[in-house]
């Protein structure tokens, strides 16, 4: 997309108000998502007493969202600069698929991680090592590397192996419109929908199995279930609308390309960026160990975050629902008092959290 003096290879820059608006919104969401997901990755490693495999997957999802935000930030910052140029190099279907390959990888890897987190929730057990922060060299396991390699292969299948016989020009790059074989596009959207939906089903099944247990695993599963419901709903809406646009354009060959690009910009790009922006906030708000780790890592958050003012999620029993009001012994302390208490290394034997951890390990 470099400036070129050849008018045959040039297209007029997009200067419509909608394009400026979308670019500005995506840049704001990308900056926020990049900063918060980078910080939440550090917090995930310190979120005891969550099991290490669960922390590892949550950190992997946060890294994925950080990469997605960084990619979108670079892309929109470049567009923001070149939109004022008198001539832009015309985008083709081949160059568009090359540009959007990292985006497809992030979407597939995110869906696969959500699916694995749902499956993993049915087999979690606390170990004594889970009470301590996770080492950085344990952040990536062999099977996580395998999943990433499979996601790269699937991304290549949906982009590089598309039989694009004609390198057609495009007004604006959109990966769903650049793939010439429509069944690949529908297969990609179907795969993402199924992975997110199946992951939610598995974590809801885990919450049913854990409903009678009063442990940190059950609290964490119920908290993650709330996050999964919101994020899966947003993903389903995004992917469903994107599929409708692709189907509309596939059925009606002479359709409004500008309308399709605008809808896909909103549904397929902005909504996932909004999810990546909200994901760290959901984790800190709903998951109690994440809140505790966040305030221990960044004590300044005690003044801004209503840490421990919320009780853990309700854990329904077979006949009724019960709320376990567990609060930190630091609930009424200021940040200075908290730091002073931690400097004295006061034992936490009276903390409700330690009692529950012992129950988990005893199980």
Swiss-Prot record:
Region ranges (Disordered): 329-363
Membrane topology, record value: Multi-pass membrane protein
Keywords for the protein's UniProt record, in alphabetical order: Membrane, Transmembrane, Transmembrane helix
Annotated organism of origin: Caenorhabditis elegans
Record's subcellular location: Membrane
GO CC terms in record: membrane
Upper classification of the organism: Eukaryota, Metazoa, Ecdysozoa, Nematoda, Chromadorea
Name the UniProt record assigns to this protein: Uncharacterized protein T09B9.5
Keyword Transmembrane (UniProt): yes
TM region positions: 20-40, 63-83, 101-121, 141-161, 186-206, 227-247, 268-288
């Amino acid at each position: 997309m470099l400036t070129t003096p050849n008018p045959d290879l040039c297209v007029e820059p997009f200067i419509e108000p909608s394009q400026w608006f979308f670019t500005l919104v995506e840049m704001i969401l990308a900056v926020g998502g990049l900063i918060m997901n980078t910080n939440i990755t550090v917090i995930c490693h310190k979120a005891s007493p969550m099991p290490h495999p669960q922390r590892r997957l949550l950190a992997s999802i946060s890294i994925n969202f950080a990469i997605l935000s960084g990619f979108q930030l670079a892309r929109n910052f470049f567009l923001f600069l070149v939109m004022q140029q008198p001539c832009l190099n015309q985008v083709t279907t081949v160059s568009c698929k090359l540009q959007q390959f990292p985006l497809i990888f992030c979407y597939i890897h995110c869906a696969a991680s959500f699916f694995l987190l749902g499956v993993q929730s049915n087999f979690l057990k606390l170990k004594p090592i889970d009470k301590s922060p996770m080492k950085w060299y344990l952040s990536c396991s062999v099977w996580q590397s395998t999943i990433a390699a499979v996601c790269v292969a699937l991304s290549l299948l949906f982009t590089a192996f598309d039989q694009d016989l004609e390198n057609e020009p495009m007004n604006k790059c959109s990966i769903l419109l650049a793939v010439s074989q429509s069944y690949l596009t529908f297969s990609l959207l179907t795969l993402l929908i199924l992975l997110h939906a199946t992951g939610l089903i598995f974590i809801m099944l885990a919450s049913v199995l854990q409903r009678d247990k009063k442990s940190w695993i059950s609290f964490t599963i119920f908290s993650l279930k709330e996050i999964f419901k919101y994020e899966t709903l947003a993903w389903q809406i995004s992917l469903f609308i994107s599929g409708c646009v692709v189907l509309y354009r596939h059925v009606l060959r002479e359709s409004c390309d500008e309308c399709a690009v605008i809808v896909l910009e909103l549904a397929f790009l902005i909504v996932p960026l909004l999810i990546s922006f909200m994901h760290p906030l959901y984790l800190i708000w709903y998951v109690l160990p994440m809140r505790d780790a966040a305030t221990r890592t960044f004590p300044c958050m005690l003044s801004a975050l209503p840490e421990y003012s919320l009780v853990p999620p309700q854990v329904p029993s077979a006949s009724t629902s019960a709320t376990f009001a567990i609060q930190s012994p630091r609930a009424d302390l200021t940040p200075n008092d908290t730091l002073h208490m931690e400097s004295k290394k006061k034992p936490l034997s009276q903390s409700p959290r330690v009692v529950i951890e012992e129950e988990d390990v005893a199980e």
